[in-house]
């Protein structure tokens, strides 16, 4: 990969499309029995505006289903807007050569899309829905609602899936707790369980360690490593320590543009990170996690 740059077109690693490179890596790791990965995301020349301001410029990005990717950059660089463009919470400016395909489709019904993508925002919902039980918060994921309203028809299978998702997040003990009485770390686990009720192929996480203390961050990261065994993870973060050992690809963003895209080991260097964040960075790696100061 080349140096960080401002063209909006990150240099691509050799060897075909991103999906082909992921398949090559899987085979090199000895995985020849699994079916081929499906394309999850394809973006070409995507611009997004907020009012009169362009907040994403010329985004070009491909991600395969099941791939683990971290989008890294300073606050305000456009990472969260990129996630919203993927999940159809905001829409690109239509222009020549613009393309945004999710599983090969331009348009999705949001309820249908949520069956394929689990989405967890950086916001914690405790203040908005304090009198929602943990189990009901997870079941509400089937309806894309903020809480479990009385008029919603809940099936036994939905309850079973919700219990399964809580167990997956090691949060079964929170099923009968009010969301408003949970800690930030507990709430985040419940919200990720909510995103997992459909058993999605991809999980999108926006700043997963936001508002969590050190112990809660560490616990959550280890739980997410288990999730990564059965679902792809697309993570937005400005914290190096959030990047799980299972994540092999990093996309760097600055000022609304992708400035680098490649293998984690190639991009996570002191020079590149210093350029990205605009401060001198000292870097260490321990047990597959990277740390900076």
Walk through the language-model features, giving the residues of each:
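Helix-to-loop junction immediately C-terminal to a conserved catalytic motif
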Residues: 87
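Conserved ABC ATPase "signature" region
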Residues: 139, 154-174
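Catalytic Walker B motif of ABC-type/P-loop ATPase nucleotide-binding domains
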Residues: 203-207
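Conserved ABC ATPase signature
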Residues: 151-153, 178-182
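ABC ATPase nucleotide-binding domains
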Residues: 271-293
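A short, proline-enriched helix->beta-strand linker immediately N-terminal to the Walker B motif
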Residues: 197-201
């Amino acid at each position: 990969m080349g140096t960080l740059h401002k063209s909006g077109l990150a240099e691509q690693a050799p060897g075909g499309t991103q999906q082909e490179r992921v398949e090559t890596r899987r085979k090199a790791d000895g995985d020849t029995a699994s079916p081929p990965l499906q394309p999850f995301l394809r973006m070409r020349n995507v611009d997004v505006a907020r009012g009169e301001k362009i907040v994403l410029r010329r985004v070009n990005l491909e991600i395969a289903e099941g791939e683990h990717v971290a989008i890294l950059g300073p606050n305000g660089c456009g990472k969260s807007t990129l996630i919203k463009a993927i999940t159809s919470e905001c829409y690109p400016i239509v222009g020549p050569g613009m393309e945004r395909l999710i599983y090969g489709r331009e348009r999705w019904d949001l309820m249908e899309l949520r069956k394929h993508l689990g989405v967890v925002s950086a916001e914690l919902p405790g203040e908005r829905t304090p009198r929602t039980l943990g189990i009901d918060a997870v079941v509400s994921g089937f309806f894309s609602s903020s809480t479990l309203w009385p008029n919603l028809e809940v099936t036994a299978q939905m309850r079973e899936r919700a219990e399964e998702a809580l167990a997956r997040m090691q949060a079964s003990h929170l099923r009968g707790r009010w969301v408003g009485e949970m800690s930030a770390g507990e709430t985040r686990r419940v919200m990720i369980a909510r995103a997992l009720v459909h058993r999605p192929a991809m999980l999108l996480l926006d700043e997963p360690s936001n508002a969590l203390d050190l112990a809660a961050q560490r616990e959550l990261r280890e739980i997410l490593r288990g999730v990564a065994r059965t679902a792809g993870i697309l993570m937005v973060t400005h914290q190096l320590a959030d990047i799980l050992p299972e994540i092999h690809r990093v996309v760097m963003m600055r000022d609304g543009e992708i400035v680098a895209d490649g293998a984690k080991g190639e991009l996570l260097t002191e020079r590149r990170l210093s350029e990205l964040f605009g401060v001198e960075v000292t870097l260490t790696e321990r047990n597959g996690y990277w740390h900076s100061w």
